[in-house]
Amino acid sequence: RKSHNMNVVQIVSHFDLGGAERIAINIAKSKESDINYHMIEVVRGSSNFSRDYMKELETAGIKYYRSPFTNSKMGIVFFPIRLIALIKKVCPIAIHTHTEIPDLSLYWTCLLAPRIMQDIKIVRTLHNTVLWNKWKSIGRVVEKFMQKHKANISTSNMITCTYQKEFGF
């Protein structure tokens, strides 16, 4: 590792208004003395809230990495290049995803470069009772991947129960 501190990369859809983004920043601001958090967005946030979000990251001393893509599909397709570069730079012990776009983006990265994730723990927070509204078939594949990696943690019992009914485990 490049430092004595452990690095954790959190992936969010975009630096913008959202419950998952709020949870991610709160985790990163938790001030674990031996953990450095890095935040990366899949799709470029461009609202006034995005500017406030990045200012909050800066104030808290959290490193963040912007997406050059405002289109979701382009952001997902090219995300592996960005994540692989970040992994090589910071050598994270864990990668933590928040919601479906980050989940799919990490899965895509692992398909393209499986060995890069070999020693990295995958953590995934379930934030919603309904997942994969528009991409059910893709969701089933990504869910098997997340279950295989024992990555799932939930923000509530209701979310856990709904998830188990929909995807098993």
Predicted regions, residues:
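A short, active-site helix/loop in glycosyltransferases that binds the activated sugar's phosphate group
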Residues: H149-F169
